[in-house]
């Protein structure tokens, strides 16, 4: 059985060797909260061990971020400094690897003016459009992972003292990323990626025209898929041929919907933590791809702001299939962190579409839009999977094939 120190070392190795597959001579940019500095250093050490040219740090702090939204002068939220544009765009053009350590208080921005948050997001989208485009199209390897911080742990385990909540969240994260104490997580990840790849191959062979989602919450949503769409999974490849895993953990296979081909109503299955606000018990009414009605029992104002960041925010960019009986779902923990919660259930994203088309990585933004994919500066996943979710795929010749039955993949998928 590994010690905590050994598990942390194994986690850092997993992110550098498998998540990013850092190459000799490659630059690594690590974005991390200051609270996670000890783990960022472990990742940096692993990267240098792998022959990394340089590790560049990009620090953040929840408390300072909240202060800025509450007290900074108003025009600050409409601009992005030139140095910040160069920081992201220049390293991306160089082909640097990007590691984001995601750890924050799910309610850090509760009570903050949503208008300021939206304007800051819009300004960032304009300034970093080259970076976002390269990220979506395989211009560089990137990986998002998480470690606990006290404010997050207490949200997940509110009835426990802080030290016990932290211990429980560490245990849950290690289980989710397949670190069991036997030192075999890298091998297990290679096997897991092979399993996802086989599922992708089957879905691509079926080449569905549309998917219909139904469950007892009231979801009845038909999602048309674009001509030439492809399903993808956790293992990505850059344009330069470097393999990487964008999310650790990942349990999903995903594709992009036809922008104007989504119709019906879809209900959330889990709360969504977005921009420091908890949004819960919500649903969308969708017509010709566009969200035309938004309702939420908690956080409705924040949700309405999220789907109006730009024109594309009110359309969809991803549909992802995750079995209800997944390693994360079976822990029966609500993480209040999309990285984990999206891998506990099927999810859909509003906003930017991934270029999930044959030859999509090489297409320009205009070409992707012409093929029916959505364009936006945002991409927000929300969970729709339940124990009774059924998904039926319709082929181009009219056959109806079960894809999900009672929350899990149908036999043969």
Show which residues each predicted segment covers:
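Active-site bordering "gate/hinge" segments
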Residues: 1-263, 393, 399-402, 409-413
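A short secondary-structure junction signal
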Residues: 110-113, 153-158, 235-236, 277-280, ...
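Long, well-ordered mid-to-C-terminal structural blocks that present hydrophobic/aromatic surfaces
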Residues: 255-311
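Active-site lining segments that contact anionic ligands and/or coordinate catalytic metals
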Residues: 261-263, 279-281, 288-291, 314-318, ...
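Dual-mode signal for accessory low-complexity, basic/Gly-rich regions
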Residues: 293-362
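Extended hydrophobic packing segments that form well-structured cores
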Residues: 367-413
């Amino acid at each position: 059985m590994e010690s905590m120190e050994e598990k942390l070392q194994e986690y850092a190795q997993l992110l550098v060797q498998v998540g990013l597959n850092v190459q000799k001579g490659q630059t690594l940019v690590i974005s991390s909260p200051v609270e996670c500095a000890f783990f960022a250093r472990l990742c940096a050490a692993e990267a240098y061990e792998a022959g990394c040219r340089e590790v560049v740090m990009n620090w953040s702090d929840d408390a300072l971020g909240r202060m800025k939204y509450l007290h900074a002068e108003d025009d600050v939220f409409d601009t992005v400094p030139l140095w910040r544009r160069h920081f992201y765009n220049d390293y991306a053009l160089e082909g640097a690897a990007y590691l984001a350590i995601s750890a924050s208080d799910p309610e850090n921005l509760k009570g903050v003016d949503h208008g300021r948050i939206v304007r800051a997001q819009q300004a960032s989208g304009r300034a970093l459009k080259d970076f976002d485009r390269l990220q979506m199209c395989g211009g560089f390897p990137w990986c998002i992972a998480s470690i606990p911080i006290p404010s997050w742990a207490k949200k997940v385990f509110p009835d426990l003292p802080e030290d016990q909540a932290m211990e429980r969240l560490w245990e849950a994260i290690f289980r989710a990323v397949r670190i069991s104490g036997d030192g075999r997580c890298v091998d297990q990840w290679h096997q897991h990626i092979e399993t996802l790849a086989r599922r992708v191959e089957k879905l691509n062979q079926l080449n569905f025209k549309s998917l219909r989602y139904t469950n007892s919450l009231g979801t009845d949503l038909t999602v048309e898929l674009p001509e030439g769409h492809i399903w993808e999974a956790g293992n990505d490849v850059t344009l330069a041929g470097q393999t990487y895993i964008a999310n650790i953990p990942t349990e999903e296979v995903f594709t992009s919907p036809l922008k104007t081909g989504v119709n019906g109503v879809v209900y959330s299955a889990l709360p969504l933590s977005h921009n420091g606000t908890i949004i819960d018990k919500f649903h969308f009414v969708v017509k010709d791809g566009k969200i035309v009605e938004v309702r939420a029992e908690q956080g409705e104002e924040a949700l309405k702001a999220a789907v109006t960041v730009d024109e594309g925010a009110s359309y969809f960019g991803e549909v992802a299939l995750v079995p209800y009986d997944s390693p994360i779902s079976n822990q029966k923990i609500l993480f209040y962190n999309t990285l984990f919660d999206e891998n506990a259930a099927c999810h859909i994203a509003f906003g930017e579409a991934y270029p999930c088309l044959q030859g999509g990585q090489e297409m320009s933004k205009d070409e992707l839009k012409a093929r029916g994919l959505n364009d936006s500066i945002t991409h927000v996943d929300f969970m729709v999977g339940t124990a009774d979710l059924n998904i039926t795929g319709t082929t181009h010749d009219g056959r109806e094939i079960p894809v999900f039955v009672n929350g899990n993949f149908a036999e043969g998928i």
